[in-house]
Amino acid sequence: MRIGFVSIRHRSNTFARQHRSLILSPWPQNNQRHDLGTNIILPGVEFDGIELVPLVMPVHSAGGPIEPDSFSTLLTELVTILEQQDSLDGLILEVTGTLLVEEHSGELLLLRRLVERFPSLLVGILADQVAQLPEAVFGLTPLVLGPHHWPGIDRAQRLALLVRLLARWIRREIRPVAALERRTMLLPLAIQRTDCPPFDQLPPLLAAVEQNPSILAVTVFAGFPYADVAEAGMTVVVVTDAAAELGKTAARQLADLVWDSREQIAWPTLTIEEAIHQAMQNDSTGPHLILDTGDATEAGAPGEGTAALWAALDLGARQTLLSAIVDPQAIEIVLRHGIGTPIELELGGKTDHRHGYPIPVRGIVRRIGCGQYRRWSPLAGGELLDAGPSAWLEIEGRYEGHLDVVVSGRPVPFDELGLARALGIDVATKRIIILKSAVEALAWCRQSDPFTPLVRPAQVLQAVTPGIATPDLAFFSYRSVKRPAWPLDTY
């Protein structure tokens, strides 16, 4: 049995000021066993008599909604790629569940095109933890599931389950039926954590529910409050084997449980200045990891925010690393100066002042690189990223402080230290590490293997910073979200 695999993961932040385009590249035919990442099943490898066939190179990005012309081209190219396949028994789509084309669900548009062109092809969907899919998606395929953990460190295991369920569906051994239960809970990415209360109860609870032989898969999707759409909020999806009423009951009970736990959620409250000062005063061994939540590129923020940069310089932080500042103009200046030369320039804040203004800095160019590197986060270990031409700057701060800053030409997920290491920075020598991440950095900093203990943080501090990924939802003006919505409105 051959099942096609397509991964198009783009998180659309409707508060971003620039639309994005997506480019689809066919999977190299001579490289069927290319590694999609250490935490994902390897396409081209058979298991249980099933061959998972990669069709396109994975797309992994975040930013504004997708330009309609770009998405139309993507659909046409994907259909052409599928038409060129000799035989496929089924198809798996890996998506975020938040891709938007203008105000329309990209996943729904994609699924409709595939169903129209290939009506007999059964499709299963592996969605991100932030998914908020329209109900119409489930009318086209009921086989939709996602991770049990936030962040989704169990992605490979959930994909394995989906492959096996899709194979059983193809063989007509099961008849999947999906039940949905929504709650208009707007959960910022920073609080989507199953490593602490109250959501730490979810992984074991969902696993227990799936022990029922009539229940095929259960997922709690946290939602994505940075997409102002009618479907915004938390969704429980229960997929049963032709047991619709059982699914509805289970979905309602789980949704009520999540809703009833809302007042137990611990929201980030530290400012970036407070977080850095607290880390500077802490004498414990190991680095202190600070997350710049408002400018988290994993949520579609531009990564050019300067709140953390300003705070670290103003407080005179030492042995501190900031990764990263997206500033292609600064990169051009750095390239003209070269390695080892003194430099003065304005850094960050060039296009969107909601994340801060350019900061005049002075320092030394320590290293310049191409910006291509392999991720080492368990979310997608081994995935090749391209941050564009990048540099390591050592910048002078107050009180004889010095700050190492990674500057990149384009945004990528700054939830790990892969780019810093690629530039030659010895991250194990840093007392404070600041990442442009809301929550996904927790995927690696809570792991002890295979990552060296020298880079595991002694503590993690989530700082509330300005930007289109901030956990402070009062920052946003919603127009499409259904009201009342928690925590915006009183219940």
Model-derived segments and their meaning:
Residues 3, 190-401, 406-407:
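Hard-cation-handling environments
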Residues 15-19, 66, 103-105, 134-139, ...:
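Short acidic, glycine/serine/threonine-rich loops at helix termini
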Residues 51-56, 62, 95, 99-101, ...:
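Cap/lid and interdomain-hinge subdomains that line or gate substrate/regulatory clefts
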Residues 4, 9-11, 68-75, 83-174, ...:
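Active-site histidine-anchored catalytic micro-motif
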Residues 76, 259, 374-491:
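Extended hydrophobic packing segments that form well-structured cores
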Residues 1-48:
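N-terminal amphipathic/basic leader segments beginning at the initiator methionine
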Residues 1-2, 54, 80-91, 275-288:
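Glycine-rich phosphate/diphosphate-binding loops that line cofactor/substrate pockets in enzymes
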Residues 43, 47-82:
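Low-complexity, highly charged intrinsically disordered N-terminal segments
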